[in-house]
């Protein structure tokens, strides 16, 4: 029961570096992936009501997009349990992990920042450079 309660409070989202792997797995069309990669669009996806949905789209280099992603994710929120946050990555680009840690520290919300690697199944769909943030909301 306690685990189910926690699962309902967990918020998970991530930013993809490229859409090639999503297209190869059939999660988006090849044309969409090609256009997004040409324009430098980095989508932010989240699990909402048990479904994977695009939340926002960012343009630019991944470290800059990650900074915007953190701002959009955390700015003005007071419903976050600040005991810990997980940063999950799949072969992150140079500078991305530092950018995400700096962004999290800027908001001063989290006591523990824990780095994890994305597993092979999710990494196979998302591809290298994917960065995700996982935290729990307050009860």
Where are these regions (language model features)?
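Mixed-charge interfacial surface used for oligomerization/domain docking
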Residues: 1-139
